[in-house]
Each structure stands twice: as structure tokens, then as C-alpha cells.
């Protein structure tokens, strides 16, 4: 090539802003833009949410990681995130330093990113707690939780992290490659977790989960010589209605090798290496998850909670439509969430089935349980349709009211109110308020017509909006260090805000009847009502908007819980 041609090429590269990969200054500029010191999208319990890795400390402690630092003259150390060897060593030292896990990560296999997977595990834990409430499960909180990892990989990352993060979790890891299972078994043995993790050898293109129905310890397992794990799974499927509490999966993305290669060419910043079995499957990610869905409708409640990661958002809604339209699964039994690490996002699709023995039914137009008052059926929308954010905000502005008193209770209360004086009325109101707290909680937990699928980040946003704009004057503050309180708050408020507004005609009719019966009381209590209205107006800056008293009672209930919980 002539000198003139070379100069022309350099000019063209300058015009197109090409970055020389050997230029460390340019590399540092790019990596500084990419790396964030905190990530509010991580799960609240994720260790790295407020404690990003200290590369300088890691480099001083691990010489094998120190050689990948590219900016030792800077205050904050960094690595080349496109270098697969650097990211692999980072994963290895983080597992050792922060979790006490020592693993071997062979070349040419997937290197797992930690924060996404930690978010995934904590999200599953949250959903299992919610599912326990929905199913009225009275199992001991320390009961062994059994998980199934579909495609466990050489690192066996989900079972290893799950066993470290949750003392009562155990796993069965499934894979189709003998060599992969050898590496995975070695990582399990190194960390002395044979008592919690078992590996299962499956065949390519065979059933993904159905074979586990006939699974027995020591049968078709990779580590069949292990005796320690047998105590945890000894014929549990015969004694219980379900075989496992949950399954999780990070499915292969691509249909074939050409699609994989095209993805690398279109995204030169991508650091994606892995074996063919890890990256490619017939039909790609969409068909693989479809197979899991199909098998789940054969297994039903044998696995309590089905989950899978989705790498391409374009596949999420079609898979949800398959669950709803093809298999007629109610929408309130489907959940999704987004997992975020830096600029990388993954999605999770999950669904569950209801046992026949539970009081909840799977029909879309069911009313709330008969254990609650029949009067509530008029106040709750019977259609399982997802509300948009604008619709929910409209609910906030209008205020949400739930008629929690039965007809009998209303009659009794009316008779009592007619006979009691003003002081007794005040006492009855206090007692009714206390009873209403219990009734609200019971109604929420027993109601099966609640739209339960919503994004976790949207939940937090909407709850914050609710606190700031509806519960005006409330002095209650959520302590982010209290996991239990925060989880309950998110769960209860999310369920409650998804109720449809009450028909004003129904309310007007009820109010007219009550007003006719209580004219005497209203005349006697005008002074008290005026005083109460003045107090409400002083506390409420919403220009006449109705404060949702039900949510206020829930918050007061949570405040009592908060006082009983010790801070971490």
C-alpha cells in the first residue's frame, strides 16, 4: 500500500472517530463513561448496590488481577471490559473476596456476571415470600427451599451463590455436557457444598424438566456417590405435593452460529464468549423458553414457581401471550422484572400454578373469597386487566375506598350508633379503625382477583408517588435497612393500588341509606365532624382530594411492625 493511501485511510478514520484499541488514553475515557460507582436499579439487598468493587484493593490482594489494571496512575482503578480474560479474573476474585467462593473458570465457556445473578436470586426469594402468602402456606420459614438450575454451566454460579446467600436453599443443577458437569462438580467440591448442590445429567433435545419427576438421589446424577445430599431430598416428592420450590434458567440466546457471529459483529463492544451449547439452541431463546412453558403445564404444581431470564426484550411479550392465550393462565399468576447491571439489562419471566386444595381459583373473573364479606364484591373490579400508570395515578387522585364491613356488621353498627352518645361513638370509631386494619390485611391476602404482575422498579416509583401525593401529612418513613418491612410495604401497597375505583352510584346509594338511618346521629355529631374536617383540611394539601384511609391504616400497621423489628 502506498504512502498516499495510508494517509487517506488515516484521514477517513479521523473523520469517523475511530478509536485505536491500543491507545490507553482513549480506552480510559471509554471505560470511565461505562463504569458507575453505584446502581440504584440493583436489588436493595444486593451487596454491590452501595459497595461497588474496589479495584485498587483487589489488585493489591490478588496479583493475578493486578496485571489487568489499565490505569494505575489514576485514583480509581479500572480494567478493559472488552477483555474476556480481565472480566473472568474479576469474577473469580470477587467471588473469593466477597463471598468466600473459589471457582475455576475454563476458557471458551461463559463467564457469569455477578450483580445480575444476585439480583435474580434475591428477586426469586421475594417472590417465594409473596407466593407463600398467596397460597396460605404455613411452612416453617427455615424449611429447606429446593431450586432447579436449568443449564448450570461450568461455574455452577446460581447454586453456589444461592447456597451462600440463603442458608436453607439447596439446588439441583442440570446440564447436557459431561465436561461442563466435571468443572461444575469440581467447583462444588472445592467449596464443600456437596450437601446442598446435586448435578443432573440430561440429554440434548430431550425434556428439560419432565425427567426430574422420576428423579431419585443416586439415579442419573453426575455426583451419584455423594451421600450427604441424600438427607435433604430423601423421597420428598412422595411426602409433599411439589418436587421443587422454583426453577431458574439463563437460556441460550441464538438460533445458530451465524446469528451468534452477526451479534458479535454488530456489537464490537460485546464481551460474549461461550461454548456452542451455552450460546446456541434450536429456535433460539424463544423456542427454548416455550419448551419450559409447555413442560410446566404438564408438571403444574410439582414446581411451585417457574422462572427464566430473557436476554431479548422482544421475546418477552410473545411469551406472556403464549401463557395467557394458548394455555389460559390468569394474568395475576404471571410476573416480570428487569435486571440491570450498568448498561446491560435482562428480563425475568415467571409464572405459577394454584393447587386445587387452596381457596383461590384460577378463573379470570373470580370474586374474592367467600370468607370475606359479600358486600366487597360490589367494590372490586372483576376483570383481570392491567392498569396503566395514568390509570393508577387517576386512582390516587380520586382516592380508593373499600367497603370492608358486611351487611350484618353495618346493621349492628347503625343500631349501636343510634343508642350511643358522642363519647361512645368516638370509642366505636377507634375500635372500628383497629378492626379495619385487620380486615384490610385479611382482604388483601385472601383476594385472588388482584393484578399481581408489575415491574419492581415501577412498584417503587408508584409507591413513592403514592406517599408523596396521597398520604399527605403522614410522618411515617420507611427504613431501607429493614428488609422485611420494605418487602411487606411494597407487596401490600402494590396489591391495593391495583383495585379499580368503586362505582360512584353504588357509593351514593349506600350513603343515602346510611344517611337516612343516621340522621339523628349526624345532628348530634355536627360539632365533632366540623372539628375533624378542620383537622383534615389542615393536614391535607391535595385541594379536596380524598386521602386513602385504607392505605393510611396499613402504614400505621407497618409502623407498629417497624417498632418490633431490630435494625440490622
UniProtKB/Swiss-Prot annotation:
Residues 365-383, 409-431, 507-538 have a biased composition (Low complexity). Keywords: Methyltransferase, S-adenosyl-L-methionine, Transferase. CDD domains: AdoMet_MTases (cd02440). Residues 1-20, 363-383, 403-431, 503-538 are annotated as: Disordered. InterPro entries: DNA_methylase_N6_adenine_CS, METTL16/PsiM, METTL16/RlmF, SAM-dependent_MTases_sf. One of its GO terms (cellular component) is nucleus. Pfam families: Methyltransf_10. One of its GO terms (biological process) is rRNA base methylation. Residues 7-20 have a biased composition (Basic and acidic residues). GO terms for molecular function: nucleic acid binding; U6 snRNA (adenine-(43)-N(6))-methyltransferase activity. S-adenosyl-L-methionine binds at residues 117, 151, 175, 250. Its EC number is 2.1.1.346. It catalyses: adenosine in U6 snRNA + S-adenosyl-L-methionine = N(6)-methyladenosine in U6 snRNA + S-adenosyl-L-homocysteine + H(+). RNA N6-methyltransferase that mediates N6-methylation of adenine of U6 small nuclear RNA (U6 snRNA). Belongs to the methyltransferase superfamily. METTL16/RlmF family. This is U6 small nuclear RNA (adenine-(43)-N(6))-methyltransferase. The lineage of its organism: Eukaryota, Amoebozoa, Evosea, Eumycetozoa, Dictyostelia.
Amino acid at each position: 500500500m502506498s504512502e498516499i493511501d495510508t494517509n487517506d485511510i488515516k484521514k477517513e478514520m479521523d473523520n469517523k472517530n475511530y478509536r485505536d484499541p491500543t491507545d490507553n488514553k482513549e480506552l480510559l475515557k471509554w471505560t470511565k463513561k461505562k463504569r458507575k460507582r453505584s446502581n440504584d436499579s440493583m436489588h436493595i439487598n444486593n451487596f454491590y448496590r452501595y459497595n461497588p468493587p474496589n479495584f485498587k484493593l483487589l489488585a493489591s490482594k490478588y496479583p493475578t488481577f493486578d496485571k489487568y489494571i489499565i490505569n494505575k496512575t489514576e485514583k480509581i482503578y479500572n480494567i478493559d471490559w472488552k477483555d474476556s480474560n480481565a472480566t473472568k479474573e474479576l469474577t473469580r476474585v470477587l467471588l473469593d473476596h466477597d463471598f468466600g467462593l473459589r471457582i475455576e473458570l475454563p476458557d471458551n465457556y461463559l463467564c457469569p456476571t455477578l450483580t445480575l445473578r444476585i439480583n435474580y436470586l434475591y428477586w426469586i426469594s421475594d417472590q417465594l415470600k409473596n407466593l407463600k402468602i398467596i397460597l396460605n402456606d404455613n411452612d416453617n420459614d427455615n424449611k429447606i427451599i429446593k431450586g432447579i438450575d436449568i443449564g448450570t454451566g461450568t461455574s455452577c454460579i446460581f447454586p453456589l451463590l444461592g447456597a451462600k446467600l440463603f442458608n436453607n436453599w439447596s439446588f439441583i443443577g442440570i446440564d447436557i455436557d459431561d465436561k461442563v458437569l466435571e468443572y461444575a462438580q469440581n467447583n462444588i467440591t472445592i467449596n464443600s457444598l456437596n450437601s446442598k448442590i446435586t448435578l443432573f445429567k440430561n440429554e440434548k433435545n430431550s425434556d428439560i424438566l419432565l425427567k426430574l419427576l422420576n428423579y431419585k438421589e443416586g439415579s442419573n446424577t453426575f455426583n451419584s456417590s455423594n451421600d450427604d445430599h441424600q438427607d435433604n431430598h430423601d423421597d420428598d416428592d412422595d411426602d409433599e405435593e411439589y418436587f421443587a420450590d422454583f426453577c431458574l434458567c439463563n437460556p441460550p440466546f441464538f438460533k445458530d452460529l451465524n446469528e451468534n457471529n452477526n451479534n458479535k459483529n454488530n456489537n464490537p463492544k460485546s464481551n460474549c464468549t461461550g461454548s456452542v451449547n451455552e450460546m446456541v439452541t434450536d429456535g433460539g431463546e424463544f423456542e427454548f423458553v416455550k419448551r419450559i412453558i409447555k413442560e410446566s403445564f404438564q408438571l403444574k404444581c410439582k414446581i411451585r414457581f417457574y422462572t427464566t431470564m430473557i436476554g431479548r426484550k422482544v421475546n418477552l411479550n410473545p411469551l406472556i401471550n403464549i401463557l395467557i392465550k394458548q394455555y389460559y393462565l390468569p394474568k395475576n399468576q404471571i410476573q416480570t422484572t428487569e435486571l440491570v447491571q450498568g448498561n446491560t439489562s435482562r428480563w425475568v419471566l415467571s409464572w405459577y400454578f394454584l393447587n386445587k386444595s387452596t381457596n383461590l381459583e384460577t378463573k379470570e373473573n373470580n370474586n374474592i373469597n367467600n370468607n370475606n364479606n359479600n358486600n366487597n364484591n360490589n367494590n372490586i373490579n372483576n376483570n383481570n386487566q392491567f392498569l396503566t400508570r395514568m390509570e393508577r395515578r387517576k386512582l390516587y387522585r380520586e382516592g380508593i375506598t373499600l367497603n370492608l364491613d358486611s351487611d350484618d356488621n353495618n346493621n349492628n353498627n347503625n343500631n349501636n350508633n343510634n343508642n350511643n352518645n358522642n363519647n361512645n361513638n368516638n370509642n366505636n370509631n377507634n375500635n372500628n379503625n383497629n378492626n379495619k386494619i385487620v380486615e384490610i390485611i385479611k382482604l388483601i391476602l385472601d383476594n385472588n382477583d388482584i393484578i399481581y404482575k408489575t415491574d419492581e422498579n415501577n412498584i417503587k416509583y408508584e409507591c413513592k408517588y403514592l406517599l408523596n401525593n396521597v398520604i399527605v401529612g403522614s410522618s411515617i418513613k420507611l427504613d431501607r435497612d429493614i428488609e422485611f418491612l420494605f418487602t411487606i410495604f411494597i407487596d401490600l401497597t402494590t396489591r391495593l393500588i391495583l383495585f379499580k375505583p368503586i362505582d360512584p352510584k353504588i357509593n351514593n346509594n349506600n350513603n343515602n341509606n346510611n344517611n337516612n338511618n343516621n340522621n339523628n346521629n349526624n345532628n348530634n355529631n355536627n360539632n365533632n365532624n366540623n372539628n375533624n374536617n378542620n383537622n383534615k383540611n389542615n393536614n391535607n394539601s391535595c385541594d379536596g382530594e380524598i386521602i386513602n384511609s385504607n392505605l393510611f391504616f396499613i402504614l400505621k400497621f407497618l409502623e407498629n411492625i417497624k417498632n418490633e423489628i431490630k435494625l440490622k
